[in-house]
Design a protein with these regions (language model features):
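Calmodulin-binding IQ motif helices
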Residues: 167
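Pyridoxal 5′-phosphate
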Residues: 1-164
Length: 167
């Protein structure tokens, strides 16, 4: 993959060619095609999805569900497993809330690494009265200590949450 060709699809790099953008979980940069598609939607097609009983709403609902199917196919999963959220933070909050209500029992344990982003720590601490948070340390290279992880997994472990990016 040629990084220059990829960067050329993002308008922001025209004025900021040396920009290194690492805040994608909160606010992703947009490629030209996405900006054009969004503009077209707001200009020509905008309607409430799954809410209206009129042509614009039906067409946009179909596009929305077609997108869900494409994501599901790409991930080789069912469309029922795909939930669209506005940010990684919202997704983490949703998962923590749902798990605390349906899947977590008193005294269950969740293993969280010291590398977690703040947005991935707060939701679990909010439900800590029900569960126990087990911190996962780092090795001498400041990487996740997988040997320690194996030692911490036990019959009470319900979830292991290790972020793969910290931006």
């Amino acid at each position: 993959m040629n990084i220059s060709n990829l960067k050329s699809r993002f308008p922001v790099f025209k004025k900021n060619p040396n920009l290194v953008f690492l805040d994608t979980a909160a606010s992703a940069l947009k490629v030209d095609e996405m900006i054009e598609a969004t503009n077209n939607c707001y200009t020509n097609e905008y309607a409430n999805i799954h809410r209206g009983n009129y042509e614009l709403s039906s067409k946009l609902t179909k596009k929305f569900e077609d997108a869900r199917k494409k994501v599901a196919d790409y991930l080789n999963t069912s469309e029922n497993n795909i939930i669209f959220v506005k940010s990684a933070t919202e997704g983490i909050n949703l998962i923590a809330s749902c798990m605390s209500k349906r899947f977590l029992e008193d005294d269950d344990e969740i293993i969280l690494s010291y590398l977690e982003h703040h947005a991935n720590l707060i939701p679990w601490h909010l439900i800590e009265k029900k569960i126990k948070i087990i911190p996962l340390g780092l090795n001498e290279n400041s990487e996740i200590n997988y040997d320690e992880l194996n030692d911490k997994i036990n019959s009470k472990t319900n979830l292991i949450k290790i972020g793969r990016a910290h931006v």
